[in-house]
From Swiss-Prot:
<feature type="disulfide bond">
    <location>
        <begin position="52"/>
        <end position="66"/>
    </location>
</feature>
<keyword id="KW-0964">Secreted</keyword>
<dbReference type="Pfam" id="PF07740">
    <property type="entry name" value="Toxin_12"/>
</dbReference>
<feature type="propeptide">
    <location>
        <begin position="22"/>
        <end position="50"/>
    </location>
</feature>
<protein>
    <recommendedName>
        <fullName>Omega-theraphotoxin-Hhn1f 1</fullName>
    </recommendedName>
</protein>
<dbReference type="GO" id="GO:0005576">
    <property type="term" value="C:extracellular region"/>
</dbReference>
<feature type="disulfide bond">
    <location>
        <begin position="59"/>
        <end position="71"/>
    </location>
</feature>
<keyword id="KW-0732">Signal</keyword>
<keyword id="KW-0960">Knottin</keyword>
<keyword id="KW-0872">Ion channel impairing toxin</keyword>
<dbReference type="InterPro" id="IPR013140">
    <property type="entry name" value="Huwentoxin_CS1"/>
</dbReference>
<dbReference type="GO" id="GO:0090729">
    <property type="term" value="F:toxin activity"/>
</dbReference>
<dbReference type="InterPro" id="IPR011696">
    <property type="entry name" value="Huwentoxin-1"/>
</dbReference>
<keyword id="KW-0800">Toxin</keyword>
<comment type="function">
    <text>Ion channel inhibitor.</text>
</comment>
<feature type="disulfide bond">
    <location>
        <begin position="65"/>
        <end position="78"/>
    </location>
</feature>
<feature type="signal peptide">
    <location>
        <begin position="1"/>
        <end position="21"/>
    </location>
</feature>
Amino acid sequence: MKSIVFVALFGLALLAVVCSASEDAHKELLKEVVRAMVVDKTDAVQAEERECRWYLGGCSQDGDCCKHLQCHSNYEWCIWDGTFSK
């Protein structure tokens, strides 16, 4: 009878350790996924900034500005060029 109780308690302790380790691994995996998402989002924003300048972004010529924007000659920032097409 004592051995059955001992085996049961040992099994429960082992199960608790395995579940705890699994939970820690799950938390680490979740942290890595969140970090990857944040890094990807940051890289995407930087890529957009490199491709073209948004509204009121600094520029030196029309080619620096995004679609439907033009470089204002006096203030050197991107403004709307008056077009609506997609």
